[in-house]
C-alpha cells in the first residue's frame, strides 16, 4: 500500500481506521514528515498503491497521527505538527541540517495540535479541511520518537510519550485526547522554551459544533450543559475551524460524572 516515492520503509506512527461499511484508512508519517493515507474498499484485502498526503504542505513536521471514521468517506485525523519552515536546513539537536523530523527538532520549533476532516475521503480527489486546534504549543523543541535515544533538555523530551488518540461517540462527535507538554508560563509566552516544555498534562478537545461523522445525524450542536466542576479545574475555549468548533477540557480526569 502507498508504495510511491514519498513513503518511508518502515512506516512510522501508523494507524488504521475502518468506517461503517468496512472501508479502511491507513495513516502514517511520510519521508517528507507529512501525514499520508492509503485506502482499501475491500476490508483491507487490497490497498491503493499511490498514497494521499492529507496534511497541508505548510505543516513541515508531523508526528503521532491518529484517526477514526464514521460513515464511508467521513474521517477525522489528529496529529502534532509544526509550521516553522525557516528552521529547515538549520542545525538540529545533533548539529546536522534539520529535515523536519520531530525527533531532532531544534529549540526554535514549536509543535501544535492539528485536526484534519474529510467528508468525502473515498472520492478520487478528496477534500481535506485542516485547522491548528491548540492556541499555544503542545511541545517546544524535540519530541522523543525513539525510546533508546531520548534527550535530557530541561528534563526528558519523552514527556509526551505516545498516548494521543482520537475517537468518536455514538453521535459521530470527535474527541481528541493528548498530552500537553507546554503549560503554565510556557503556554503564556513568558518562557516558551524546550526546558520549560516538559509537562505531561492530559487534555481533551471535542467537537463543539459542526458535521457529524455519521451522515444521518447531520450537524452537531454544542452540549446544552457544561460539566459541573470548579472553574479552576476546567478551561473551555471555542476555537474556529472551517466548518466546526472545537472545545478543550483541561484536566479531564477531574470531571465528575453526572
Give a label for each model feature:
Residues 1-224:
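Extracellular, repeat-based ectodomains that mediate carbohydrate processing or recognition
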Residues 37, 196-198, 230, 252-255:
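Intrinsically disordered, low-complexity sequence elements enriched in Ser/Thr/Gly/Pro
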Residues 226-240:
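Juxtamembrane/start-of-transmembrane alpha-helix segments at the extracytoplasmic/lumenal side
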Residues 237-255:
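A cross-kingdom C-terminal cell-surface attachment/processing module
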